[in-house]
UniProtKB/Swiss-Prot annotation:
GO terms for molecular function: endopeptidase inhibitor activity. This is Alpha-2-macroglobulin. Belongs to the protease inhibitor I39 (alpha-2-macroglobulin) family. Bacterial alpha-2-macroglobulin subfamily. A lipid is attached at C22 (N-palmitoyl cysteine). It comes from Pasteurella multocida (strain Pm70).
Length: 1905
């Protein structure tokens, strides 16, 4: 070792020791883990059982060992005084103790924590050395309420009530001992005397948390200073605990005297049933009195307007007898109270506003309890002002020009009103529309005032306000006001103001926003936009933007012909105009292209007599269809747009299988010629990675096919395929599909459930119900002796039946619990017919109601946990019939004294109508009344409750055809009609409301809806649709047929509420349509309190049989395996077809549905026509309003990388699987018929689903057809074998043999194994099997130490029909896989001159897939051995990893000295290295690089990216430059004008120029790019100068000069011969390399210390060789340290190789006196640079002998699978743990077949954050993960994983780990009997190989029968 190296090493060690010492000193209290004792919450006694909250000690860091989380601690922690309970680590930071019963109150405790129970990797506060002290919550009592109670029914019952609440259950005996109740007298000197102790009783609340103390009854007090006092002694304690109260609790209640009756008064304003204001005098008495007694002894006097002092405000002391003699007596009208005695009494009266009353009550009334007044009492009450109101009546803005033309104004309590009328100038109308921020009837123009666009008139009105409480109606005739020459028709802005005192305001509409004086009671002004016109307008906008405008006469209800309809733009231009035709319709093309000043704002409609308008695109004018069934698929605006139906052959695939996709593409209108249109097919993995891209060109028929073989490492989960069309440089998806990729097993069974009672679509009876489960083999025979498990759930439901969709049935359980009954049924075994019977008795749950029974059954394979499932539901009811009703009336809005009829039917369980007698119809009125109710304290009070009072009862009989029943509407109110049977059980209940004048305002807000019913749901083109319409009133309507546009329309008139209308469908209409009806009220109708417009929509379909291609598919009904079957497809037209057949067991797993493609092309489309209108704004005529006035008023990239890491963590010894039984014909031509053939696999038995889809050659007809072929041999073997085993595992396997012959068979069964397995016991069996029956044979196998896919061969010999011996053979495979995932190990060490170092192999690996080698060299090329091995074994996919993996071949392939190393790396013969061997790796990179390059020449991390990555682009360029310099052959096309290489250089030039705000990392990549350009002799002087300038301006010299950016710049300047600049820049780099660096570091932004060191070494060795001696020893030591600590990734490995290669070029030396020995023998081969040895044995001690005069380096590299699980857990930067428990969370090591175990995986990082971690969790053999669609996504949600994959033998999860623990839970199912080893769970960082963790060996888990 030279002096320089020694000094360097010594300095490094010294620095390291110094840093370590500093670190130890920093382990102080500030950095230690702290803890906090959270206060214990008081037990929640409201829960049942009570919820006792635990003691929780929270730590500031992950204090729990990860293996202890969620587990009970039984030692290492104690509590004093002792208390039974459980200590549990609830998380890694929370330690809790929960007592068995409850916490004693106010108890001090001490907790001692032994640090053995804590995470040993952390440093803890010194406070943990002391006991942790805490105190439980103290017992407290609170006096909540106290009052003197007078019983409302018994006058002599009066006493005090005190309510106390307690924090904990009180000790009853102690409480009653601590309690005193006394009658006391309180003196004026604050003393008191006890008059007498009182008896008391105590009522306790639930769980003794509340107590009501009721004193004994007392007489009325003789004086007003008597009290009932309660005292609770402070010595009171809780039932559990010893702490007492802090002080005594004392409180008292005053005892009233006999003369304590008093009252207070007030006058309020209330609304009466006529909607008028009236005065009500309220008297509030201190005790309950009788109203009829008060009425006799009360007087009211209207005082003079002014007091004797001439003041308007009266005071009580001003009232004298003299005043009263001059006062006027006021009559009072008593209002009834709900009870005889009441505290509040009320009287109607009528006095002038602001006048005062004197109320006098004589002392001749006695209150309940004997209370009286000493003498007559009086009080003063003054009347408030009546509310003021002025406003327009009704909602709307349109007055018919043919009608009365009167606007109705309602006023109250105003003497005068002012009406301002602004006539909008027609040319200014556009401003009103364009600037309106409000709605139509109340516009808000913002800054623009109406004065600017209108001509104004003003009219003042004086009103007779003698009765300010009454409403006055004014009918304003606008025609008379504007009686100038012009007609009154037009558009007006009206504002009405009450009592206006400022008539000369500059701007009339200053209160355009609502008047600030308005409040809840008063309205001083109102404004409205009024249109006087006879033109109603409806506009319908289609999906393509075309417009249909309908114009009708408001007065006549008829379409208006010849009206001018103009589209007005924002600037007032007429951009379109036309006349309506005889149907009142005008059509416009799309207005979408009119923009800015020409943007359309309204339709202006005019005739010679009338003018109207409709704003365009105003939300308040659009009809809201959200309450109708208008949802569905949205059609494209372009009828010629393409739509594609993508389908696959089976819905689920295993990795490495071929996906077959059929594509049917059609234009939306089926008219466009499709031939040769290019489309793009993209296929994405579950992580969103583009896996396949293919351009297809459409066939003329529209049928195409794409096939793609999935990678062997294909991600599991849901894959996505899409078809894109390119339009104007944009890609649009026109079709897509999803499918599953899973390592699944096809089903072998099928299952079906039936019930013994035939119920059709009705229900079954609850008694004598039997569910029969039929289990069958998929090859058609009963599955005998199979276990079947079942459970049932009973839920209430509201019965509904499709054939009686309009009838409402009843369920009296509908408000009860969601689940009525749930149970597991006894396990059954199938009989010879494959049936298992489950008797079900639901009698006790039936009652007189209906429930839905959900019956779930699982049928299991023989002695296996694999099962098939089914769910069957049926309605259950004990009733022999159910009653339903329907009505055409709106039952929430029935007018008084108008007929309303409901129709009743009764149906039996078969849903046949039947007659029912002896029913009763009881009418009940629902109202709230006061009901005497006992309180929790024991006292009685009146409470308001909803009750139902019987009004009348009638008998009812329902006929077999149904019976009409007329509802009673004679009186307004809320009613229920209850139907009951002869046993008084409710069988239906109808709620309805009768609306009277008092609630007409409610009716006005009601949303009126048409009821529409079509005569059927599906029609043929050109057929007539019959529509039954029920409207709220008579009127006129418009019917339209709509979907994406209006296809047909028809006007109609209805003189009654109900009518039947008809409209004809167009001939060319296909698919889904909507009947849309707008119905406007007749202006002469009396129904003015509902909206003038009602509307409704109902969908329908037109069948598409004319598009259906007639197909017939023939296949053999039954064949045997190995035979060739023919499928014949016939068509009535020349066609293109796809024929495919699939094993039904696969389709069953996938849930595959063979659907009709026509239903895809003709789905339920959404209603996309937008309807705008003004008909809902029509105001009622003034005369109609006055009729009622008499009675009423108005994925990021890191995640993608993680996905691709899966390959390295999969099972390389996975079993060989059979090819799926599936056939795909590809597209074939059919001219009449076509026959294709398929050979059935030799060992397949099951059912083939045969399917075909075809399109006619012209593409206008489409069909699909399916059939089945049964494949069944005479003797069928069905083995049950685990999918995987681990060496040493034992498992029972079995074979079920089905004898499908007609005679009994004696079968000789023999099983043979491969070396991976051995038998325990015999391998041959003799079995007797009855004809058409099954039997089984059992074997026991054990896995040996041989890894790999192993085949078990079963041979069954039997006699065929000719009595010849025949063999039936079945092969089944399983995987014998190692217990640990793949491991890498590299050991690098320096050997001093003249020394020998002997080292054992780091790991003991299985021979299979093992690679072990040693390299020894005087140059540090030994370092290259480890990283090269790692790179070539790393499964890489992203661009950086792909380039890194190819780098060893680029650097070494042309150097003969590296041939042994390359031989080992490529695993090929030496003569092939440099040719075929390198081609495999390099061609992979060369093939993928074009897909990673963007159109701009740069490169993305993955393919199909839009943006390139700076570093990746430079790195690829570096790779290409190195390859070209080393004379590797690159594709010639890359060097063309737009070739890959030249485009890469262009991208380098582009990205070498810095941008403002670049980070240091970005400038580093730009400098890297500039360096590479310099290598290519392209002088990037400007870029270099700009980078340098930006570095100096934005970053400190300390920051950037020690960064890699400085090295790249120095190298570039050196090549440009600017040595002074180069030397200045390289000097800080050299200093950085010899300086110490932090021990802790991470990878970020393509940089870490190892990448930095190797990059700098590369630059110095290549460009500054003279400086190499300054850094080589120190930097090589660091690199060795990092490699030995496994702290390398693909990029750092590649950069190390580049550096070592450059170093070797400067240190060429001959190999001398170096040997690699084993047991004293030389085992290496020599090259000019190093000695190399392949190591073949499992265990070897390797000696490295250095007999030279200089130091040498050796490297031991191993890649493979460890033979044994580690006995100790490993935690390097990560901690990981996994547990197996049952459902209750108890650890388990033994389960029964079919049981589910619950897996919990926990992970956390030792630092704050570790990115890109992969977890590999191998399942024990004999278990399978419970997979279901979406399972991967569920796992992701549960612990924020980036991706989770479920494989056949393991779970792979990718995530970022944090200091906070993450938890993943999933489930495994025991499917095989045996004893299986539990593999450790393994986690590692994908970028920092030193960060990893695994759990210790956990022994075995046993699965038994």
């Amino acid at each position: 070792m030279n002096k320089q190296y020694f000094l360097s090493l010594f300095s490094t060690l010294a620095v390291a020791l110094t840093l370590s010492g500093c670190w130890d000193k920093k382990q102080d209290e500030a950095n230690a883990i702290q803890f906090n004792v959270n206060p214990i919450e008081i037990t929640n006694y409201d829960e049942t059982p009570k919820e006792v909250y635990p003691l929780v000690i929270s730590f500031s860091g992950p204090a729990a060992p990860i293996t202890s989380v969620n587990k009970e601690l039984t030692q290492g922690i104690s509590i004093e005084p002792a208390l039974k309970g459980k200590w549990v680590w609830n998380s890694d930071t929370l330690l809790s103790f929960k007592p068995e019963t409850d916490w004693p109150t106010g108890q001090d405790y001490r907790v001692k924590i032994d640090k053995k129970i804590l995470n040993p990797q952390l440093h803890y506060t010194q406070k943990l050395n002391e006991p942790v002290v805490f105190k439980t919550p103290e017992f407290k009592a609170t006096l909540v309420e106290q009052y003197f109670h007078q019983d409302p029914t018994q006058a002599q019952v009066r006493h005090a009530i005190f309510k106390l609440s307690f924090t904990h259950p009180v000790d009853r005996q102690k409480f009653e001992k601590a309690l005193q109740v006394n009658l006391v007298r309180k003196n004026n000197d604050n003393t008191q005397n006890i008059l007498s102790p009182l008896k008391f009783n105590v009522r306790y609340g639930e769980k003794d948390l509340v107590a009501w103390v009721n004193s004994d009854n007392v007489a009325l007090a003789q004086s007003d200073n008597q009290y009932i006092e309660v005292k609770i002694d402070k010595n009171l304690t809780a039932l559990l605990g010893n702490n007492s109260l802090e002080t005594d609790i004392i409180s008292s209640v005053k005892v009233p005297t006999k003369y304590s009756l008093d009252f207070s008064t007030g006058i309020l304003i209330a609304q009466n049933e006529k909607n008028e204001a009236e005065q009500v005098l309220h008297l509030n008495f201190t005790h309950s009195i009788k109203g009829n007694e008060l009425e006799k002894h009360i007087s009211a006097y209207l005082l003079p307007e002014f007091t004797p002092e001439n003041h308007p405000h009266w005071r009580y002391n001003l009232i004298s007898r003299d005043v009263l003699q001059h006062a006027v007596a006021v009559p009072l009208q008593r209002l009834a109270t709900e009870t005889t005695y009441a505290n509040q009494q009320s009287f109607k009266l009528d006095i002038p506003e602001k006048r005062c009353l004197y109320i006098e009550v004589q002392n001749k009334i006695t209150a309940l309890g004997g209370y009286e007044m000493k003498g007559a009492l009086g009080d003063l009450a003054c009347a408030p002002d009546y509310p003021k109101y002025v406003g327009f009546v009704g909602k709307g803005s349109i007055l018919s020009s043919i009608g009365e033309r009167k606007v109705t104004i309602a006023t109250r309590n105003f003497t005068k009103v002012k009406l301002e009328i602004g006539r909008i100038q027609e040319e200014q109308l556009r401003h009103l529309i364009a600037l309106n921020q409000g709605n139509f009837q109340n516009p808000d123009l913002g800054q623009l005032k109406i004065d600017n666009i209108a001509d104004f008139f003003t009219k003042n009105y004086t009103l007779n306000n003698k009765k300010p409480q009454e409403t006055t109606y004014l009918g304003i005739d606008l025609e008379k006001i504007v009686k100038q020459a012009e007609p009154a028709m037009g558009i007006y802005w009206l504002k009405v103001t009450g009592d206006s005192d400022n008539p000369n305001s500059t701007l009339r509409d200053t209160s355009q926003h609502m008047d600030w004086r308005n409040d809840a009671s008063n309205q001083f002004s109102d404004y409205r936009l009024i249109v006087i016109s006879d033109l109603g307008v409806i506009a319908k906008k289609a999906v393509d933007g075309t417009q249909s405008v309908f114009v009708q006469s408001i007065s006549r209800g008829e379409p208006v012909e010849g009206a001018t309809v103009s589209v007005i733009s924002r600037n007032g231009s007429i951009i379109k105009s036309d006349y309506t035709n005889e149907q009142g319709v005008v059509n416009f093309s799309s207005l979408a292209h009119f923009k800015q000043e020409l943007a359309p704002v309204m339709y202006l409609v005019s005739t010679q007599e009338s003018l109207s308008f409709l704003p365009i695109d105003k939300y308040d004018r659009n009809l809201d269809y959200s309450r109708f069934d208008v949802g569905g698929i949205y059609a494209s605006e372009n009828a010629a747009s393409l739509k594609a139906y993508l389908f696959n052959d089976r819905g689920i695939y295993r990795p490495n299988e071929t996906l077959h996709t059929g594509i049917i593409t059609k234009a939306q209108d089926w008219q466009l010629a499709l031939n040769n249109i290019p489309l793009q097919f993209n296929l994405y993995s579950p992580s969103g990675m583009l896996m396949h891209k293919q351009t297809i060109r459409l066939e003329k028929s529209g049928l195409n096919s794409v096939s793609f073989t999935l990678p062997e490492t294909a991600e599991t989960g849901e894959w996505f395929a899409e078809l894109l069309v390119t339009e104007k440089n944009n890609q649009t998806e026109i079709g897509s599909m999803t499918f599953q990729v899973q390592e699944f097993q096809p089903d072998n069974l099928k299952i079906k459930t039936t019930f013994n009672q035939a119920h059709a679509e009705g229900w079954v009876a609850p008694q004598d119900l039997v569910a029969t489960v039929q289990l069958a083999n998929l090859f058609g025979t009963p599955a005998q002796n199979r276990k079947v498990q079942a459970n049932l759930t009973l839920q209430p439901l509201l019965p509904k039946f499709s054939q009686y969709a309009d009838y409402r049935f009843f369920d009296n359980q509908r408000n009860k619990s969601a689940i009525l009954y749930e149970t597991e049924l006894n396990e059954q075994v199938t009989d010879k017919e494959g049936k298992a019977h489950f008797p079900i008795d639901l009698t006790q749950y039936a009652e007189n109601t209906a429930q839905m029974l959900y019956f779930t059954a699982d049928g299991f394979e023989n002695d296996s946990g694999r099962a098939v499932s089914t769910v069957k539901s049926v309605m259950v009811s004990a009733q022999p019939w159910l009653i339903g009703y329907q009505t055409k009336n709106d039952l929430a809005y029935l007018k008084r004294n108008t007929p309303a009829v409901v129709n009743f039917i009764a149906v039996n369980p078969k849903l046949e109508k039947v007659a029912v007698e002896h029913l009763k119809a009881t009418l009940l009125e629902r109202k709230y009344v006061s009901v005497l109710t006992q309180q929790a304290s024991g006292a009685y009070k009146y409470e308001s409750k909803l009750i139902e009072n019987e009004i009348e009862q009638t008998t009812l009989q329902i006929n077999a055809t149904g019976t009409d029943f007329t509802l009673n509407t004679g009186k307004s109110g809320d009613y229920v009609l209850v139907l009951s049977n002869e046993h008084d059980q409710e069988v239906n209940r109808i709620h309805y409301a009768v609306i009277g004048n008092q609630n007409v305002s409610v009716a006005m807000d009601k949303n009126t809806e048409l009821k529409l019913r079509l005569n059927k749901k599906q029609f043929k083109p050109h057929e007539e649709i019959e529509i039954a319409i029920h409207a709220p009133y008579a009127g006129t309507g418009l019917i339209t047929i709509e979907s994406d546009r209006v296809y047909a329309h028809k006007w109609f008139k209805a003189t009654t509420n109900s009518s039947v209308q008809r409209i004809q469908l167009p001939e060319n209409f296909e698919g889904t349509g909507y009947v849309n009806v707008q119905f406007s009220r007749d202006i002469h109708s009396d129904d003015i309190f509902t909206s003038p417009l009602s509307y409704g929509v109902v969908p329908f379909t037109v069948n598409v049989d004319n598009r259906r291609l007639k197909l017939q598919l023939d296949s053999p009904k039954k064949v045997k395996s190995g035979e060739t079957v023919e499928f014949k497809l016939s068509s009535d037209k020349p066609s293109k077809a796809l024929i495919y057949a699939v094993n039904e067991g696969i389709l069953q797993v996938a849930g595959y549905q063979f659907t009709d493609p026509l239903s895809y092309f003709f789905p339920k489309y959404a209603l996309q026509v937008q309807t705008a209108q003004i008909l809902d704004l029509i105001l009622p005529e003034f005369s109609k309003v006055m009729q009622f006035a008499q009675t009423g008023g108005d994925a990021d990239m890191n995640m993608e990388l993680a996905m691709k890491m899966a390959m390295a963590n999969m099972n390389p010894f996975k079993r060989k699987t059979d090819k799926p039984v599936a056939y795909w014909s590809g597209i074939v031509d059919i001219h009449g018929e076509k026959t294709v053939s398929y050979q059935i696999p030799e060992e397949f038995n099951g059912n083939l689903k045969v399917m075909a889809i075809a399109l006619s050659h012209d593409g206008k007809h489409l069909g699909h057809v399916a059939t089945e072929t049964l494949v069944r041999n005479d003797l069928i073997l069905s083995p049950t074998v685990p999918l995987t085993l681990t060496p040493g595992d034992e498992s029972e396997i079995n074979v079920v043999i089905a004898n499908n012959t007609n005679k009994a068979q004696r079968v000789n069964l023999k099983a043979t194994l491969e070396p991976q397995l051995s038998f325990i016991g015999e391998a041959e069996k003799v079995i007797d099997i009855a004809p058409m029956s099954e039997s089984r044979a059992d074997f026991v196998i054990k896995a040996t130490q041989e890894l790999g896919s192993s085949t078990i061969r079963f041979i069954a010999s039997y006699e065929d029909a000719q009595q010849q011996k025949v063999d039936a053979v079945r092969h089944v495979t399983l995987s014998v896989r190692p217990i640990m995932p793949k491991q890498f190990a590299t050991q690098i060490q320096k050997v001093a001159a003249g020394k020998t170092v002997t080292s054992p192999l780091p790991m003991t690996l299985f021979p299979q897939h093992r690679q072990q080698s040693a390299l020894f060299s005087a140059a540090p090329l030994a370092l290259a051995q480890g990283v090269s091995t790692y790179l070539t074994h790393y499964d890489n996919y992203c661009t950086e990893q792909m380039i890194s993996a190819a780098m060893p071949m680029v650097l070494f392939s042309k150097n003969p000295a590296y041939q042994p190393l390359l031989t080992a790396l490529s695993r090929k013969a030496p003569q092939n290295v440099g040719s075929t061997g390198t081609h495999d790796t390099l061609e992979k990179a060369f093939k993928l690089l074009p897909s990673r390059q963007t159109e701009y020449g740069n490169y993305g991390i993955w393919n199909n990216v839009e943006e390139g990555n700076l570093f990746v682009t430079a790195y690829v360029a570096h790779f290409l430059i190195e390859a070209r310099e080393r004379h590797l052959v690159l594709p010639k096309a890359w060097f063309g004008q737009h070739g890959l290489f030249n485009n890469t250089i262009s991208a380098l030039e582009e990205q070498s120029v810095p941008q403002e705000g670049d980070s240091l990392a970005t400038l580093r990549q730009r400098a890297y790019s500039a360096y590479l350009l310099t290598r290519l002799a392209k002088v990037p002087s400007n870029a270099l100068l700009s980078i340098r300038t930006q570095l100096e301006q934005q970053f400190s010299a300390e920051e950037w000069q020690k960064d890699t950016v400085s090295a790249w710049l120095a190298a570039a300047y050196h090549m440009l011969k600017q040595d002074n600049e180069a030397n200045k820049l390289i000097e800080p780099v050299i200093n950085q390399l010899v300086a110490a660096r932090p021990a802790q570091w991470t990878y970020d932004a393509y940089s870490d210390p190892l990448i930095k060191d190797s990059t700098m070494l590369y630059v110095i060795a290549r460009h500054f060789p003279a400086q190499l001696s300054k850094v080589s020893d120190s930097v090589l030591e660091r690199i060795v340290q990092d490699l030995n600590q496994q702290r390398y990734n693909t990029l750092s490995s590649s950069m190390v190789l580049l550096a070592l290669d450059a170093y070797a070029q400067q240190h060429q030396s001959e190999l001398a006196n170096l040997q690699i020995q084993h047991q004293g023998k030389e085992i290496s081969q020599s090259t000019p640079l190093f000695r190399f040895a392949d190591l073949a044995d499992t265990q070897m001690d390797i000696s490295f002998v250095n007999n030279s005069q200089q130091p040498a380096w050796f490297a031991l590299s191993q890649v493979g699978y460890p033979q044994n699980a580690a006995q100790q857990a490993l935690s390097q930067g990560l901690e990981v743990d996994r547990s197996y428990t049952d459902k209750e969370g108890k650890p388990i090591r033994q389960v029964k077949i079919g049981d589910v175990i619950y897996v919990t995986v926990k992970i956390r990082a030792s630092t704050d954050y570790v990115s890109d971690v992969i977890i590999t969790d191998l399942y024990p053999a004999g278990f399978e993960v419970l997979w279901q669609q979406g399972a991967e996504d569920d796992f992701e949600d549960s612990w924020l994983a980036q991706h989770t994959e479920l494989r056949e033998d393991r779970l792979l999860s990718y995530l970022d780990a944090e200091k906070e623990m993450k938890v993943l839970k999933y489930q495994l199912k025991a499917v095989n009997i045996g004893t299986f080893q539990i593999p450790p769970i393994y986690a590692e960082s994908m970028y920092d190989r030193a960060i990893k963790a695994y759990s210790a060996s956990e022994g075995q888990i046993k699965v038994r029968k």
